[in-house]
A protein has these predicted regions:
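Low-complexity, serine/threonine/proline-enriched polar segments
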Residues: 70-145
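Arginine residue identity/basic-tract feature
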Residues: 9, 56, 96, 108, ...
Length: 196
């Protein structure tokens, strides 16, 4: 999470100021892998974000943070929520009517499902199904988040009303990619932790 220091007029994140975050990236090992966390300067539509990532050959193993808001427009107070944008998961059996595209690879015989990431409407359906499934299966949520109350219905309504709005992402990469990302317009903060 970020916070804005009114006195210094700087944003601070997990790695400190922007300058401190950049300095920490410069010190990384060239050959090691890291989990990079990036915040975007502004909310971005899923379609725009996907195309941006694909043009940079980052559309594989990329997790995007989805912004959901309450009826007053404030970000839902909960754990960060998001999704992988590339087809992932295995084809398991579930109620496809209640949770369409719960698994992006809904039907292995359907080669179109390999391109689901390019279809904003299907990705919205996928994300809504993920949230709905978690809402309806609290035993999974308890394992992940204990007894924390998560406003799934509010999040679902937000996506239905405003679509998928991306505010950040995470990717596994090496130092070279981190330095390239640092130079990208549209990224407001970037830091990395070693991949263990």
């Amino acid at each position: 999470m970020h916070f804005f220091d009114e006195d210094t007029r700087q944003f601070w994140g997990p790695a400190g100021s922007e300058e401190e975050a950049y300095a920490s990236i410069e010190k990384l090992d060239d050959n090691a892998y890291y989990i990079a966390y990036a915040s975007l300067e502004k909310l971005t539509s899923y379609a725009h974000f996907y195309n941006w990532a694909k043009n940079r050959e980052m559309d594989a193993n990329l997790w995007c943070a989805v912004y959901t808001s309450d009826e007053d427009g404030y970000m839902c107070d909960s754990v960060p929520v998001g999704m992988l944008i590339n087809p992932s998961g295995s084809c398991i059996d579930w109620d496809r009517e209640t949770y369409p595209y719960l698994c992006q690879l809904d039907n292995r015989a359907d080669t179109d499902s390999w391109h689901i990431s390019e279809d904003t409407e299907k990705m919205e359906t996928h994300f809504i199904s993920l949230l709905s499934y978690l809402r309806d299966h609290q035993e999974i949520v308890k394992i992940l988040n204990g007894d924390q109350e998560i406003p799934y219905d509010t999040m679902i309504e937000s996506v239905k009303q405003d679509g998928l709005r991306i505010y950040g992402f995470s990717i596994v990469c090496q130092k070279k990619k981190l330095l390239q990302l640092w130079d990208e317009e549209g990224i407001s903060y970037l830091y990395a932790v070693p991949l263990d």
